[in-house]
Amino acid sequence: MKIINLGILAHVDAGKTTLTESLLYTSGAIAEPGSVDKGTTRTDTMNLERQRGITIQTAVTSFQWEDVKVNIIDTPGHMDFLAEVYRSLSVLDGAVLLVSAKDGIQAQTRILFHALQTMKIPTIFFINKIDQEGIDLPMVYQEMKAKLSSEIIVKQKVGQHPHINVTDNDDMEQWDAVIMGNDELLEKYMSGKPFKMSELEQEENRRFQNGTLFPVYHGSAKNNLGIRQLIEVIASKFYSSTPEGQSELCGQVFKIEYSEKRRRFVYVRIYSGTLHLRDVIKISEKEKIKITEMCVPTNGELYSSDTACSGDIVILPNDVLQLNSILGNEMLLPQRKFIENPLPMLQTTIAVKKSEQREILLGALTEISDGDPLLKYYVDTTTHEIILSFLGNVQMEVICAILEEKYHVEAEIKEPTVIYMERPLRKAEYTIHIEVPPNPFWASVGLSIEPLPIGSGVQYESRVSLGYLNQSFQNAVMEGVLYGCEQGLYGWKVTDCKICFEYGLYYSPVSTPADFRLLSPIVLEQALKKAGTELLEPYLHFEIYAPQEYLSRAYHDAPRYCADIVSTQVKNDEVILKGEIPARCIQEYRNDLTYFTNGQGVCLTELKGYQPAIGKFICQPRRPNSRIDKVRHMFHKLA
């Protein structure tokens, strides 16, 4: 049986969830389609999802059409969850991108299409809601060519009499994009030679599989119009990305979720081989797991199974596997399946409104962050505050909704701040000697620090031989240095530097590793004071698509948001701007873009890295440490 993993993507309210229900119903997987309005759909399981008509977390369902099984990965539609969209896309064999016949190409549609092109995923366009009044399909096609891709092939005609209907498009004009993209076919066309239909279809299929040609189909998901034709196309056009002739197992985890009873489940895409119940599977050089229970999606439901075949999705109860964990032979994993997630750029504190719910909150955050690589948290050991780091403000709104709905916890979140870093300005050394006041520790430590190029991270080297200072003391120095790097002169993490352990001395038998561990961060701080530090802040690459009249406004606003526009291009009455901007400014820049373009502007961003901060220095309160703070202050007075 052929297995296809299909993604359905759309802008908010284009009908994505309704289309999923219609596909399940038309294929016979379910007896009655669910309704977004009534909250009875199978994929949007959260109240927030149903209330907004958007998808926040990936859901999996399936149907069968003749000898083809289709797993539907109902991917998130909100752009604050682009990282989860990419993670979902990584398991897909193909995608259906919805376009609302009434609303046309929205900013969100373009961002999703950009993601599909980035991942080179074969994509079908489905123009939904064609039964609404005032629809101008030629205008929609024109907009698709201008804002998405000129390489579209309209596969159907839409008729109005005696009632609205869709039929195959047999006009020769539909093949223009196919002919113009192939030199051999174009030469035949220019010389007036006849075409074989098989030639055109073969070239269409080749380019479709390469993700460079996009067939267009039509319908109404709400009224099941054109859905059967869409199912037939899905079953015939998409191929599984599973390598042929491979019997060895290879699978990858793409989703983690917890049940209401706090049971942990991992979703795995099988790329090759077959997974059997009671198999013992290698997940690392030293670690193996035994498969004791497994489920697969079948006809709209999840069923227990003894096997999961190549190409399928399998759900395993497991406490060991992590996101992107690989089961079996990782050499068989398709290259584009390796997805890097951006680092969280914002941080804040979160607290419960009722103190007795604190432990519940901590457990909930552990589960949520387990399945979301863009969310991290820790508890300050002194203030006991819960610190969250994350990517976007809407992400926080959704987390609060999950906490309230799933865990019944009411939380308060402070205004977030950007996560800065510190980098030494120059090379410096500092040594604190044993028995020299105010050093209370039975240890001498000398450190040197020097800046490295931005993006290098922290490098540590010991230049003290193990014959002179044993391993336990050496390890303690490194641990103390790494602890000291957590807070620089302004309270931010220290990065992009090389730290060398230059000198160490101990007294036997009174010296202990703790003496070196506690002294090292104090020595590091003094070295940083001599070197000085600069603040680094996260920067983003941005790419803006907007009506041409927005150009002057963009240049006018750029200095206000510290944005640097590096290139400008005008295409089809649209301006394309590329540049860089501090992450702290992007939300306001986006808000202005939306306001001044009446929602037509699109802003694509990705993390560029850290650069020297512009403007005033932002300090973060230092986390107290009762064991070393008194000594720190003594050395501070000496400086």
Swiss-Prot record:
PROSITE patterns: G_TR_1 (PS00301), G_TR_2 (PS51722). GO terms for biological process: response to antibiotic; ribosome disassembly; translation. GTP binds at residues 10-17, 74-78, 128-131. GO terms for molecular function: GTP binding; GTPase activity. Keywords: Antibiotic resistance, GTP-binding, Nucleotide-binding, Protein biosynthesis. Residues 1-244 form the tr-type G domain. InterPro entries: EF-G-like_DII, EFG_II, EFG_III/V, EFG_V-like, G_TR_CS, P-loop_NTPase, Ribosomal_Su5_D2-typ_SF, Ribsml_uS5_D2-typ_fold_subgr. Belongs to the TRAFAC class translation factor GTPase superfamily. Classic translation factor GTPase family. TetM/TetO subfamily. Abolishes the inhibitory effect of tetracyclin on protein synthesis by a non-covalent modification of the ribosomes. This is Tetracycline resistance protein TetO. It comes from Streptococcus pneumoniae. The gene is tetO.
